[in-house]
C-alpha cells in the first residue's frame, strides 16, 4: 500500500516514521511518503534525516520518502496513493481539504 502523510509537524512525522518502521520490519509492505508544505523544511529533513524542530531525537528511516513545497509537489505526492493521511494543524485543514477536493484516494483526517 502506498501511503502519504501530509504535514511534517510532530504528529505527521511520528505517524510517517512509525509506518515506515513497520514496513522496514516486515510487519507491513507499505511505501510511506512524508509531505511538508515548505521546500526548505524538506531539504532539512533530507539532509539531517530527522525533524529536529518538531520531533527531535527521532531518526527518519531511510525508507521514508520526503516531498514537499508548492501545489505541484502536493499533486505529485498524492498521485497514485492508496491512502492519504492529513496531519496538519486544524487551522490549515480547511485549505488542505479544498486543495484535495478532487482526489479520489481514501483520506484519513487526524486532528
Identify the function of each model-found stretch:
Residues 1-58, 65-78, 99:
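NAD(P)+-binding Rossmann beta1-loop-alpha1 motif at the extreme N-terminus of oxidoreductases
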Residues 62-66, 79-111:
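Rossmann-like NAD(P)(H) cofactor-binding subdomain of soluble oxidoreductases
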